[in-house]
């Protein structure tokens, strides 16, 4: 049919003279290309956590993990120069959550779990590594930050209060030892 100004009508009327074909259930229906990528994004108020949970750590978080758990952050309440002071300072620099009153270094993993943090024995960049008192031969334990996970599984950490020196200092931990420690992710 002809529409306005002699152009073909974009919405022609149905042609009642044409033969119709009945629909069957054995056909296929193709909507074109299938979408690729993730269709569900996990929300997190902290943009760094949101990027990690939907990127690097996708499908690795524990069942029921709430990325918006209480952080316990009320500012750096740790004594200057202590390992806990550095861990708090560095996590804040990285934009990752950290509690203000997690206790001595050796207490951090349990304190963080109690607040809802994801804690396990697999290191990831930006994590707090927790050394128990027995692992460092003192009554307080120790904490540091995982700065890099190397291809061979070893890690590089930054830490403070090593041999009474403020720091921060860097050192490596061999791959065979990394799973002996607890790591606070976020």
Predicted regions: what they are:
Residues 62-186:
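Peptidoglycan cell-wall recognition and remodeling modules
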């Amino acid at each position: 049919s002809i529409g306005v100004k002699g152009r073909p009508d974009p919405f022609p009327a149905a042609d009642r003279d044409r033969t119709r074909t009945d629909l069957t259930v054995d056909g296929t229906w193709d909507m074109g290309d299938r979408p690729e990528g993730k269709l569900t994004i996990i929300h997190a108020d902290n943009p760094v956590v949101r990027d990690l949970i939907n990127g690097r750590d996708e499908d690795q978080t524990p069942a029921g993990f709430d990325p918006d758990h209480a952080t316990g952050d009320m500012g750096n309440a740790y004594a200057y120069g202590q390992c806990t002071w550095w861990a708090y300072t560095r996590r804040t620099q990285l934009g990752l959550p950290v509690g203000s009153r997690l206790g001595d270094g050796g207490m951090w993993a349990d304190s963080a779990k109690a607040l809802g943090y994801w804690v396990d024995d697999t290191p990831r960049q930006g994590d707090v590594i927790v050394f128990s008192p027995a692992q460092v031969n003192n009554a307080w334990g120790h904490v540091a930050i995982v700065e890099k996970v190397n291809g061979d599984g070893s890690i590089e950490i930054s830490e403070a209060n090593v041999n009474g020196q403020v720091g921060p200092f860097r050192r490596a931990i061999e791959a065979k030892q990394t799973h002996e420690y607890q790591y606070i992710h976020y």
